[in-house]
Amino acid sequence: MASEDTVKRKVDSDPGHDDQPLPRKRKEPSVNNKSQSSDHQENEQIPAKKHVKCPYLGTINRHLLDFDFEKVCSITLSNKHVYACLVCGRYFEGRGKNTYAYTHALEERHYVFINLHDCKVYSLPDNYHVEDASLNDIALFLKPKYTKEYVENIDTKIVYGKGLDGTDFIPGCIGLNNLKQTDYFNVIIQVLCTVATVRNYLLLLDIDRIQPPDNVISTLVELIRKIYNTKNFKGIVSPHEFLQAVGVASKGLYKIGVHNDPVALLTWLLNRLDTKLRNKKTKESIVAKAFGGQLNVYTQDGDNWTQKITPFKMITLDVPNAPIFKDDKEKNIIPQVSIFQLLQKFQGESAHTSPNGELCKYKIWKLPDYLVINIKRFTKNNFFIEKNPTIVSFPMKNLDMGIYIDDKSPFKGDINARYDLACSVCHQGNPESGRYKIHVLHPPTGDWYELEDLLVTSVLPQFVAQSESYIQVYKKQQTGNGATTHNDNENIDMFD
């Protein structure tokens, strides 16, 4: 009895049997079951052919490529085995026969696709792997990669990028798309980019090492990498994936379309990063190393005062109330106060009411590498939110915090307590319809830029100092030997 292979060869060689193919032993999936087919299984049965020169590379349209949005199939919304068509930019599931990517290639004659996970390019429906140096820029646009040496020199080396339309941009100082009332999201993302310790750590972080996986951290890592990408085709970035992840993780507290307080968002985000990025051995995190300070809190207990060392990542300064009654000459005068007057709160001399209603005195016990200051401008009652427009004047350089350290602290006089401003978030307009923007320092050039969603404008330092600042981030000055915290290898790898 002839084997099946022998019969098949005879049929293939006999022209009379062209219309009589052998019966299939396995039923192929129908078109209606495309979404049920597994790309992984199909690729095992139909492996990609060996590399050949692709004749369709000229059909790729880089202007239509956008990898900032959620990587799901445009038809099934599945996030498994998703490919992007390099001709039209749409996302499709699968690569084997009877998948939507395969069907799209046949119907639209779009033959070049990229895997959104591993950046490999394939030509469909022939299903062969395409390797060409001209595709490297697309892979770097999809998933930017950084070396340790490059990351450590970000704040010292001047680098510029150029979009496909010829527009120049500065990596790290690029606009973020406002997805509907997400300006408060955008300024907090820019704040994290100015903190070199956290930024450098995330740029080099292997997100596969985070167990269990965290979608907030993985999307934040991808977002910051795109912000510093010199190969960005557009010169702007859309934080859509990160905002979606935060919306899910916060159970709708911070989401697209709902305006919120950037201070609350920053607090929530730092706490999450601090929890998820803890070293298993030391129980420390990169967030604690960058923002971790300590306060000596004196609490009134009857006639006595008890003290307790309390950690903090942000300090709050209370702005004095603006005068209610003004004469004709004072109507157009905006009240102004110095930040040093507000910092007297941490000299431990006057008592203040804590959020839980206790009378407390505060002195700084330990200063962080990055000092985050919240200038409390908004007060909320049962009816509305009121904004205090008082201008708080502050130094751009050499903010001396040494006088606020407790005399009992072992850190008194042992550390450099001078800070330089890294960024300042300000609010413009009334509390209901106003918007947030941020002023950031570009360290390689020493220039200041105003970032308001997609708009990036160069500004003078004097303009920054006179804005209605709401959040400030000060960076501790370098020590005498020139060492910087964010270049320390221990701070870059927290998993060893």
Language model segments and positions:
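UBL (ubiquitin/ubiquitin-like) substrate-recognition surfaces
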Residues: 2-496
